[in-house]
Amino acid sequence: MLTAICYGTNPLFAMPMILAGIGTNSILFYRYIFASLIYGAFMKLVKKHSLRISLREFVALIFLALLFSLSSITLFASFRYIDVGVSCTLLFVYPSLVAVISAIFFHEKLDGSVILAICSSTLGVSLLSLTGESAGDAMSVRGILLALCSALLYALYIVGVKQMKPIQRLPNDKLNFYVMLFGLIVYVCNLRFCSDLQGLHTPLLWGCALLLAIIPTIISLETLTVAIKLIGSTRTSILGALEPLTAIIVGVAFFGEQLSWRICTGFLLVVSGVLLIIVRPRKNGVASQG
């Protein structure tokens, strides 16, 4: 629960920076660099882990970091066009996309529950796409496409973590650290080697940047690893439904976003589709361990 709630606070710390005129690449640069520094120090000083990696691991991590960073950019960019709760709910279709990608490229079977899940998620996305007074205008369409693009990129990242052999024995915390560290490359390039980096001129902005690196990034990633070990991946994934719910609550409570029947119904349909993916029977006839 803590993992999902922490990750769902992304908009809480990102939106004040967006409203202050800070660009998406600058926001994510601060998030990733603070997270990398804190995470690296934590691994080295507290966990006493070696940070050494092989050349094959380096190449794989660069590729994964690119996917992860682009997913972050598109998600945060979508906050500028549509409600944050809608953005995070659209992101939550990624388990369905993982199932489709795995079926197409790795010949995993699409059973009836997966097809039903995809239909449910698609209907939920359709309802969410019709929310708000400006539904259908260019701004809304752009935001929806950005959020869905973020979900696709994150799904590709998940598949990559699962399928890329060089990183199969890499500890989770080392994987997370290098994905964030190498992910900085995207923002450094987009900011023209930081010449376009916007400064943080108030304590509030510094606090938001630091908390963005700590709560929805480091704490979320660390508690996710612990949760999987304690209760298994299935229960952890089910509780992940609290992530878009948290984002919706943040949007309504802090940013005056409206909660309509379409948003509620779309949220339930998307989450239902995800739960069907998570708890569907495996090849041995039982749900995944957890």
Give short role names for the model-derived ranges.
Residues 1-5, 19, 36-63, 76, ...:
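Membrane-interface interhelical linkers
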Residues 17, 27, 31, 78, ...:
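Hydrophobic/aromatic residues within transmembrane alpha-helices
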